[in-house]
Amino acid sequence: MSHDKKQNLQDVFLNSVRKTKTPLTIFLVNGVKLQGVVTWFDNFCVLLRRDGLSQLVYKHAISTIMPAAPVSLFEDDKADDDAAEESATD
């Protein structure tokens, strides 16, 4: 990710789980638990797909999102950190 274009963490996270099709558990503010894969999102809602069915979930109703697998964010920054560590040990 270039440093001149800032993205918010929410968009980076949702885009990462969308691209990798990582299964998620989403807890709503009323306690309902939803599970599925993010297929699309915008500023106000997330489209969650499970068993061939889609659910449109409004972001203001979401309390917590738990991915089923680790999510890698800011991969370019991680590569820069690794390179800096290698040169420091040389």
UniProtKB/Swiss-Prot annotation:
CDD domains assigned to the protein according to its UniProt record, in alphabetical order: Hfq
Single annotated GO MF: RNA binding
Keywords noted in UniProt: RNA-binding, Stress response
Every Sm domain range: 11-71
Assigned GO CC terms: cytosol
Classification via Pfam families: Hfq
Matches recorded under InterPro entries: Hfq (IPR005001), LSM_dom_sf (IPR010920), Sm (IPR047575)
Keyword Transcription included in the entry's annotation: no
Annotated GO biological process: regulation of DNA-templated transcription; regulation of RNA stability; regulation of translation, ncRNA-mediated
Chain coiled-coil ranges: none
Entry superkingdom: Bacteria
Complex formation: Homohexamer.
Database matches in NCBIfam families: Hfq (TIGR02383), PRK00395.1 (NF001602)
Family, similarity comment: Belongs to the Hfq family.
HAMAP family listed in its UniProt record: Hfq
Function according to Swiss-Prot or TrEMBL: RNA chaperone that binds small regulatory RNA (sRNAs) and mRNAs to facilitate mRNA translational regulation in response to envelope stress, environmental stress and changes in metabolite concentrations. Also binds with high specificity to tRNAs.
Protein's name according to its UniProt entry: RNA-binding protein Hfq
Encoding gene (name): hfq
